Structure formats: structure tokens, C-alpha cells
Amino acid sequence: MKRRWKSAVAALAAIVTIGSLTGVTTYAADSVSITNVSYDSTRELYEQYNKSFQEHWKEKTGQDVEITQSHGGSGKQALEVANGLEADVVTLALEYDVDAIQDAGLIDDGWVDEFPEDSAPYTSTIVFLVRKGNPKNIKDWDDLVKKDVGVITPNPKTSGGARWNYLAAWAYAKDKYNGDEDKIKEFIGDLYKNVLVLDTGARGATTSFVENGQGDVLIAWENEAYLSVKDYPDDYEIVTPSISILAQPSVAVVDKVVDKRGTRDVAEEYLNYLYSDEAQRIAGDNYYRPSNQDILKEYSDVFDLDINLVTIDDFGGWKKAQETHFSDGGIFDQIYEG
């Protein structure tokens, strides 16, 4: 892990007293506060996790910690942080959105190596949420391009989940058409012609489908779909497509902010603790796939662990995928506006 000795010493001097004989760190203030800027679908996860972390931090340091949450479409959230929304940590939908904050000079190089599993403490995938009984008999991506099917998915220009949705559909079409890009684009175009509304974030899309009754199928984060079924077991069911994508949400400390506020210790521990057994089970209980493979196996009755998943590496990594598909004038714009 990259060390930042000068900034770390400055931060520690502001908030702690070091016991010269015992080597024990004593936290002078009674309380500390941090802000976690996250994406749309993590509200329930962090509501539960924050309570666990508050107990952990209190036991470890004697300090109370107040945690403020901010949620929205991942791309939009990254832009907000880059433009001045003060976040001690970010827990966003994908690596590229954290890179955008790094490019703004707020996060140091090498952030992806700061925490285990490429700073992805949990993963997810993309599934379909349909109405109970599956009246349109939706089984796979092919069914989403039928003319009588209304699709709900967020806008990939603002939502991280929407970008995962798009790439999962692209992977299916690539397999179906043996890499013929013209046919792939036609397939994606037909899918988006069926989209009734492009909400800015995944939670907004869920609201459109679940609460407003729009559409026949919601392309959704796996955890978001499971939460809907949990809340409305008589109204919805999940369909797992034949091909999907390994979605890897990313976490990072916002270095410039924590060094200014003197919150590096608590911010780093906040993200480190996501890898603890307790936090990994909190992730699983909220329908995220734990990065700890042993704990993931505890949820084999919940998740389809044999699902065929492509990865972002199949698209050349996030930088290439963003530039090719989601940049202004990229393939998504060409398809959607064409």
C-alpha cells in the first residue's frame, strides 16, 4: 500500500496523541465525522454497515463516529465530488467513476491497490426483474427486443448500473452474432427503442418499474432486484439471463479531503472494515456478493454461482469501455440518438 508520510503525520498530529511508552494511539476528540458518497442502490447496505462500523470504531478508539451518506447515479456522484462535494470516502458503482475523481486531483494514484480485490469489497451482476408470473415470458436478452416489451433501465450517461446493464447486453449480442459489430449495434438499438424511460440512477429506475408500474422488465443490479422481491414477494420475480457481467463496485479514500479534515485514520478503517467477516455477511444479507469466497459460498442458496459472467477486461478495461461506448459521441450516443 502506498504510504503518504507527510500528509499522514499532519493528519495524526491534528487528531491524536501518541503514547510514547505504550505505542497506543489515543484519540483526543470525543467524536469524528465522515461522509460516504455512494451510488443509488447501496442505501440499505450502508444503513446497516454504518451501524456495525460505529460500534467497531467506538470499541477500537473510544470515539463516536457520525457517518453522512449521499446517494445518486454513480457517474453523477463522481462529478459532484470532482466539483466540490466533500467526501471522505467514495463507494461507487465502477472503477472509472473513481478514476474521474482521481483525474480531478482529489485521489492519489494507485488507489485501486489500496484495498484487497482491486478495492472491490463486494460484487454484483445484472439480472431481470419481471412481474409475477412473467406474463411476457421473458427468459433472456432476446426477449427484451420484442416489439411488445417495455424495458426500464437507467441512463448510462449518469448511472453506473446502467453502464453495467448496457455492457451485459452487448456481451450477449457479441456472443449471439459472433462479434459482428453491425448486428450487435442493431440489437442494442432495438433494445433501447423499447426503453420507456431513462432514469438518472438505478433506484429511480426501480421506482419507475415497481412503484409507478411502468414497463414489463427492469434491467437491474442483482441486489436491487432481490430487494424488490423481498419487499413485494407476491408481485415480482427474478430472471437470470444466459450471459451477464461481473459488476465490481469500487471504493476509495478521497485523499485531499481526509488530509484537509484530519480523517484519514477513520476513513481508511471504514473501507478496511468492509472486508471483515461481519461486513462481508452484511453485504451478503443485502444481496451483494461477498468478495470473500468462503463467505460467498454461505449464500449459495441465494445467488446463482454458476452464471456465465463476462468481465470488464473483455471490453479492454473501464477506460477503453468508457471512451468507446459512453463518451460524448460514443457508440451509445450513436445508437440512442440515431
List the predicted regions and their residue ranges.
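Short, low-complexity disordered leader/linker segments with a strong preference
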Residues: 1-33
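Early extracytoplasmic/lumenal segment of secretory-pathway proteins
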Residues: 27-104, 114-115, 221
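Solvent-exposed loop/turn segments at secondary-structure junctions
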Residues: 41-44, 74-77, 95-99, 133-136, ...
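Stable alpha-helical elements in mature extracytoplasmic
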Residues: 41-45, 49, 77, 86, ...
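Alpha-to-beta junction loops
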Residues: 84-90, 148-150, 211-220
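A conserved helix-loop-strand patch within extracytoplasmic ligand-binding domains
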Residues: 102-175
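Ligand-binding pocket segment of bilobal, Venus flytrap-like solute-binding proteins
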Residues: 177-242
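Extracellular/periplasmic juxtamembrane helices and adjacent flexible linkers that interface
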Residues: 258-338
